[in-house]
């Protein structure tokens, strides 16, 4: 008879405890004359008074959250409007400068009622920024008010830095620009640290280095340099957020590929940032076919003529081929 011990593994599952009381049980294991009792305890269910907008779900993957986001819309031409002709005495002057009405709770609720489940809130923080890179409290308050309207509708929100590419592009090589980028993101992180899974951060918008490299000009070394700068920006952003307080340690984040162009997502020169939380997704802007997505119907330019409709067999094939990359 062999004396080699035999190991058996059994998985025992029970229904979740939905009562306010601790549940106890004893599991008895017997093999021949050997009997072993194991006492187990199931914690009581504690109903949290914390609103859902402050909740972080420990086991929620970023992929699952992206699926929750569903159909989204961009709150463009509002908090991201820029221009040296805009009267800086009120944040609402920026909000209306490009033709938008003042954003109201009813507008945000209207998006939700129309079927949108996520809202991107682009912000040009530099509009009201002090010389020592402090965001004006009126702008921060306004962003938070719109954010709360969004979250209270059950929508997912995205906040970024928008329309400030000129100085953001200098961050990898200029210490002052890096200080500015770091300061803005630290303030965003501090202000919104209590918010949960339904708030994502995005570092910037459509950053590219055409002066260094484009698909039509420049060497492979130039391309590596240009894409490398965007990699550096992404990593700096992730590091800032993860080293801040509150729920930011586990916040789901978006990071950018070069020019947010889909084809660079699978370019070997693109590097996903190191993230201890492993909660990252790529943001991609898809303007294909350009004669429909960019040009107006009948508009004529040197590279094409705008069309008013989309949905041909060729259109679907192109879309499906790109999404399968």
Each predicted region: which residue ranges?
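Surface-exposed binding patches on compact interaction domains or structured appendages
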Residues: 1-13
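An active-site-proximal structural segment forming one wall of the substrate-binding cleft
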Residues: 53-55, 98-119, 129, 133-163, ...
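A short beta-strand micro-motif common to beta-rich folds, especially ectodomain repeats
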Residues: 10-12, 21-33
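Active-site region of glycoside hydrolase catalytic domains
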Residues: 179-325
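Acidic/histidine-rich helix-loop elements
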Residues: 76-103, 131-135, 173, 291-318
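C-terminal edge beta-strand
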Residues: 34-46
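N-terminal carbohydrate-binding accessory modules
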Residues: 46-118
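Hydrophobic faces of well-ordered beta-strands that scaffold small-molecule active sites
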Residues: 69-75, 119-121, 157-161, 199-203, ...
């Amino acid at each position: 008879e062999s004396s080699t011990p035999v190991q058996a593994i059994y998985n025992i599952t029970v229904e979740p405890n939905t009562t306010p009381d601790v549940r106890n049980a004893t599991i008895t294991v017997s093999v021949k004359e050997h009997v072993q009792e194991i006492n187990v305890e199931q914690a009581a269910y504690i109903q949290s008074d914390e609103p859902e907008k402050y909740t972080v779900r420990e086991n929620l993957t970023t992929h699952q959250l992206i699926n929750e986001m569903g159909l989204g819309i961009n709150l463009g031409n509002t908090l991201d409007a820029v221009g040296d002709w805009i009267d800086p005495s009120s944040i609402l002057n920026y909000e209306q400068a490009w033709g938008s009405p003042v954003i109201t709770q009813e507008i945000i609720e209207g998006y939700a009622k129309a079927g949108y489940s996520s809202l991107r809130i682009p912000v040009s923080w530099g509009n009201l920024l002090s010389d020592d890179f402090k965001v004006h409290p009126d702008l921060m308050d306004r962003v938070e008010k719109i954010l709360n309207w969004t979250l209270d509708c059950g929508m997912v929100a995205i906040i970024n830095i928008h329309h400030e590419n000129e100085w953001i592009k200098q961050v990898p090589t200029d210490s002052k620009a890096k200080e500015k980028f770091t300061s803005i993101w630290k303030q965003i992180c501090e202000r919104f640290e209590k918010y949960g899974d339904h708030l994502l951060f995005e570092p910037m918008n459509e950053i590219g280095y055409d002066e260094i490299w484009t698909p039509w000009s420049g060497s492979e070394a130039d391309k590596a340099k240009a894409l490398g700068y965007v990699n550096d920006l992404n990593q700096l952003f992730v590091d800032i957020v993860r080293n801040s307080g509150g729920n930011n340690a586990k916040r789901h984040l978006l990071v950018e590929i070069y020019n947010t162009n889909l084809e660079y997502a699978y370019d070997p020169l693109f590097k996903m940032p190191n993230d201890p939380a492993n909660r990252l997704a790529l943001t991609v802007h898809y303007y294909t076919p350009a004669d429909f997505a960019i040009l107006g119907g009948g508009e004529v330019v040197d590279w094409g003529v705008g069309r008013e409709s989309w949905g041909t067999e060729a259109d679907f094939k192109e879309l499906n081929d790109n999404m399968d990359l």
